[in-house]
Curated annotation (Swiss-Prot):
Function: Phosphatase that hydrolyzes non-canonical purine nucleotides such as XTP and ITP to their respective diphosphate derivatives. Probably excludes non-canonical purines from DNA/RNA precursor pool, thus preventing their incorporation into DNA/RNA and avoiding chromosomal lesions.
Pfam families in UniProt: NTPase_I-T (PF01931)
Assembly mode: Homodimer.
Membership in a protein family: Belongs to the YjjX NTPase family.
Binding annotation for substrate: 7-12
Cofactor note: Binds 1 divalent metal cation per subunit; can use either Mg(2+) or Mn(2+).
Cofactor(s) this protein requires: Mg(2+); Mn(2+)
EC number(s) per entry: 3.6.1.73
Matches recorded under Gene3D superfamilies: 3.90.950.10
Alphabetized InterPro entries for the sequence: ITPase-like_fam, Non_canon_purine_NTPase, NTPase/PRRC1, YjjX_NTPase
Protein name: Probable inosine/xanthosine triphosphatase
Lineage: Archaea, Thermoproteota, Thermoprotei, Sulfolobales, Sulfolobaceae
GO molecular function: ITPase activity; metal ion binding; nucleotide binding; ribonucleoside triphosphate phosphatase activity
A biological process term (GO) from this entry: thiamine metabolic process
Length: 169
């Protein structure tokens, strides 16, 4: 089996590899840099659209059996800005599924930078005086000190993939 992920982000690629290992799917994984078709910091529904676009763009750019798109986004709910991700999986036969990560609230110090036009990763780097946090621990890692960005993505990758390995009508 050949799986293409529509991102070269290290945390996303490693999450897909770990998820495939957990569910026992023996697959070669390739990461491809594809367009999401949404803003660099998606909000709410844009996040879903970006994940779907990445999955299909990865599928179309390769000869993969499954294309996977992971898009991180932010949504405003109950006076809080919440960060979350959408994972979308699709194949060329028309099978598709999606899932969401857990959502977590962002402190105002980060939200302020995001509302000024920065991505969450940039805001994280500024607040925590680091570089390329989105390739590693991510905002979730710096905020919780125990959950990494890779770990945040593993469960929704598994949930998005279940129709591809657990054939239930």
């Amino acid at each position: 089996m050949f799986v293409a992920i529509g991102s070269t982000n290290k945390a996303k690629v490693e999450a897909v590899k770990e998820a495939l290992k957990i569910i026992g799917l023996n697959a070669d994984v390739i990461s491809v840099n594809v367009e999401s078709g949404v803003s660099s910091q998606p909000f709410c529904h844009e996040t879903f659209v970006g994940a779907k676009n990445r999955a299909y763009n990865a599928l179309n750019a390769t000869n993969a059996d499954i294309g996977i798109g992971i898009e991180g986004g932010i949504c405003y709910y109950e006076n809080k800005y919440l960060a979350f991700a959408v994972v979308y999986a699709a194949n060329k036969e028309g099978l598709e599924n999606f899932s969401f990560s857990m959502a977590f609230s962002l402190p105002y110090s980060m939200v302020k930078h995001i509302l000024e036009g920065r991505e969450l990763g940039e805001a994280t780097d500024l607040i925590f005086s680091t570089k390329d946090s989105k390739q590693h621990e991510g905002a979730i890692g710096y905020l919780t000190k125990v959950i990494t960005r890779k770990e945040l993505y593993i469960q929704p990758v598994i949930a998005a993939l279940y129709p591809f390995y657990n054939k239930i009508e």
